[in-house]
């Protein structure tokens, strides 16, 4: 299944969660798009709830179905709780950590920075958004990329860096210091429903 490339605000309203991370999509109209959006009160079946939760998390991180399933299977090989490990692996993606460090305003913008070769991991260029960063690795920008307008604009509005990431504004370089705790990950996701979906 290909990655969704349409308007993020429309998908955010349909899924009921801000995919950009800004919350602006739901500020004025926190309901599904369309004529009947404000009045939709349909009770979802268990199947529909599981599918909805899967789609919500998949689109939140901007991952296609094949990558999503591969990451889910990798999480199942780890010690601990499958659902939590799954979310930790998604959070460890390079594009996501570029976003978390404030170098991009959205995950989609972060993915473009990585794709276009602007991002370094431990001093070496990495252009694979799904690259899995390990705790202790550093993430920065190439010298010529530090003056990009999109980066400057992102840094101007960023006012929060999660506890599992450190960031040096002078060097425009950050470190993935540790894996996140579940309490530090998106609270609007019920990962147990996703585990149930793939366990059918």
From Swiss-Prot:
Q: Which residues form a coiled coil?
A: none
* GO cellular component terms given for this protein: small ribosomal subunit
Q: Which UniProt keywords apply?
A: Ribonucleoprotein, Ribosomal protein, RNA-binding, rRNA-binding
A Gene Ontology molecular-function term? structural constituent of ribosome
Quote the SMART domains the UniProt record gives: Ribosomal_S4 (SM01390), S4 (SM00363)
What PROSITE patterns is this protein classified in?
RIBOSOMAL_S4, S4
| PANTHER family assigned to the protein according to its UniProt record, in alphabetical order | 30S 40S RIBOSOMAL PROTEIN (PTHR11831), SMALL RIBOSOMAL SUBUNIT PROTEIN US4M (PTHR11831:SF4)
Quaternary organization: Part of the 30S ribosomal subunit. Contacts protein S5. The interaction surface between S4 and S5 is involved in control of translational fidelity.
Give the protein's recorded name: Small ribosomal subunit protein uS4
Organism phylogeny? Bacteria, Bacillati, Bacillota, Bacilli, Bacillales
